[in-house]
Amino acid sequence: MTVQGRILQAAFWFLLIVGLTACSGGSSPIKIKGNIATSHDVNPDHAGRPSPVVVRVYQLRAPGPFLNADFFDLYDSANATLGQNLIIWEEFEFQPGETIEYNTKFDSDTKYVGVIAAYQDLENAHWRELVTLPDKKKVHLNIKLDSLTVSVSTGKR
């Protein structure tokens, strides 16, 4: 092969690699490591007995619609309520005293994490929490469900 042929071949491979890299999509996902934990007295029923609780975790681009919506709008029609601000949501059901490791990947467009808990006593519960994700590719995220309060933190335990 001539020198000119080798240069053309090298240029071809270089352009092919650059082109494939450019087509590979957006930014890499955000790695989430943490846990979701419920207290032993979570979600008391009318007699004060702890009960299972449903939790939703929302990946969001902006906080406004999440903060302004009521529980049933978020629970029954999240896509319509949150519109383009919603990236995706996940749902879990927990027994009192249950803890799981929450290791996942969030979309790189996620700027906020919203969490709601379907407490039986919504009127007296702090059922919604929102945190801003740090601008990092690895985030430690803890979600805690107490009797009538959901809390979220992005620091170490």
Question: Which role does the model predict for each range below?
Answer:
Residues N35-A47:
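Short amphipathic, basic-aromatic surface patches that mediate peripheral association
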Residues S39-D41, E129-R157:
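Extracellular beta-sheet/turn segments enriched in Thr/Pro/Gly and aliphatic residues
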